[in-house]
Structure formats: structure tokens, C-alpha cells
Amino acid sequence: MVARRAAGSCPAHIAAGRLGEEAACAYLAASGMRILARNWRAGHLELDIIAQDNGTIVFAEVKTRAARGLESPHEALTPAKRSRLVRAAGMWLSSNDMWDRPCRFDLVCVTTEARAPEPEQMSLQAARAAGTAQARRAAGSGLPGILGKAASRLFGAGSPQRSHRAGGAPDSPEQLLRVEHIPHAFDLSESLGGGDAAWQPW
């Protein structure tokens, strides 16, 4: 999946994290999952995305990194991080009385890189900012708006890649987000004891 978002005014790492979580959430929803919660917290423990994939509860960890970063998103899922995810998932299952539900841990890797707006986007943004009649004529001529493209491409059935664009100020840089979804990101037997099923933490 490829997602493009205009850069915001908040600190770069916070903006990148938010964009990464939004892209991950949109990707999972477009894949047919039902999003149950985002940024669920219990003390110092946190779950980025909790979703339902048919009858399975999915705890999705989102890792966002710059394209030229020294650490890949995969490497950020350390054994210590896995242990915290398992503890957080156990607390969520307990608080929602869902101990009997099968669950899994997924990893959504989001890689960001700066990218200038495409010529078509720049012309659309400039026309909108000017508020001219020419912009209205362009809209009426079938030239799709940026958000219209997002809806059609993001949720287009059978599309091998999905793209998401959101416009910002004219000539503003964008972030190109590349999203990779890894189901069953790690083996639960590494962290959990035995139960009625391998994923049950008791």
C-alpha cells in the first residue's frame, strides 16, 4: 500500500507516527478487518490497533521509520517489546471478557520518505487556493479531487496496491508512506505459557 499525506506543523516524529497509524488503520480496514480500538492504554502498556479478523482478535503493532533510518521497523519489535505487547493484550482480553477468543499479533511496517507534490496535485492546490472560476471549471470537467482519488484507490476492490492522498498548502512537501502488513509477526509460544490454546496467557 502507498499512502501520501501533506506534512503538518507538529514535530516530525510525532507527525510521522500519526500518519503511520492512520495508514495502518486504513489498510487493515480496507482488508476487511473491523477496528475495535486504537491507542489502547493500561498504565505503561499500550496497543496501537485492536481489530477483529473474522473471529480472531488482532493486536497490530505499528512501526513507522524513515526510509533512510538506521533501524528497520522489523528490528524495532524486540523481545522486550513482544513481552509488553503480550501483557497488554492479556489485560485487554481480561477487561473485555474475551479470554476464549483466538488472537494473534500482527506487525504493520510503515516506511516514510519526503516527496514533493505531483504536478497535477500542485495545479489543483494552486487553483483551490486562488478560489478562481477556473478551479470550478476544472472540477466540473471530470478532473478528480485529491480526496476523491483517495477513496477510489484506497478501497478499490482487487487492487494490488492502494494509495491515499491528502492535499495541503500549495508547494508543500508530502510524506510517501509505504505500508507492509505482516500477520502472525511472532510466535506466541516464545512468550506465553500453556493453556487451552497456545495464545491463551495462563
Swiss-Prot record:
InterPro entries: Restrct_endonuc-II-like, tRNA_endonuc-like_dom_sf, UPF0102_YraN-like
Any Pfam family matching the protein: UPF0102
Listed transmembrane segments: none
An example molecular function term from Gene Ontology annotations: nucleic acid binding
PANTHER family, per the entry: UPF0102 PROTEIN YRAN
UniProt similarity note: Belongs to the UPF0102 family.
Identification of the protein by name: UPF0102 protein Dde_1093
